[in-house]
């Protein structure tokens, strides 16, 4: 059976480049993905929306534990109240949420790999769109 120390999980900066080289470590075991996220404060609302996720929400349920920090799960277009998990707490956020890392956070997550891949792909599409939109503006600025 697979096992690993958290800091020995493979670096996956290519999967989530916006949080930096040490910010995301992950490995797929069977149909689950084990990930260690270390990030600054981050609101994923625009990433989910501009990345093309249906309804602008994450399709992946997240099971995790927060070593440090605070994560808010917001459930747009529902009557569900926001949920907050913070240092020392285990959590479950069902699909249909937007994650907001309210402060620097270090969290372990166990997620269904396919659903997480859809979320990661959408965030990367949003980043690519943002960068592509910035390039013409930079060129116009340089040409003036």
Question: Model-derived features: where do they sit?
Answer:
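A short, N-terminal "cap"/entry segment at the start of jelly-roll beta-barrel domains
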Residues: 1-47, 54-55, 83, 132-144
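Short, conserved beta-strand element in jelly-roll/cupin
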Residues: 56-73
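Double-stranded beta-helix
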Residues: 100-144
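A short, polar/proline- and glycine-enriched secondary-structure boundary/capping micro-motif
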Residues: 46-49, 83-86, 118-122
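Structural motif
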Residues: 63, 70, 96-98, 104-106
């Amino acid at each position: 059976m697979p096992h690993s120390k958290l800091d020995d999980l493979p670096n996956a900066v290519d999967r989530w480049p916006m949080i930096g080289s040490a910010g995301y470590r992950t490995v797929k075991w069977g149909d689950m993905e084990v990930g260690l996220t270390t990030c600054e404060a981050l609101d994923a609302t625009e990433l989910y929306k501009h990345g093309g996720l249906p309804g602008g929400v994450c399709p992946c349920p997240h099971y995790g534990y927060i070593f440090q920090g605070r994560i808010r799960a917001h459930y747009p277009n529902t009557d569900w109240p926001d949920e907050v998990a913070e240092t020392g707490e285990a959590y479950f956020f069902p699909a249909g949420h937007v994650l907001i890392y309210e402060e620097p956070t270090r969290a372990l997550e166990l997620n269904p790999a396919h659903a997480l891949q859809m979320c990661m792909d959408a965030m990367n599409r949003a980043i690519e769109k943002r960068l592509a939109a910035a390039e013409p503006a930079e060129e116009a600025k340089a040409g003036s």
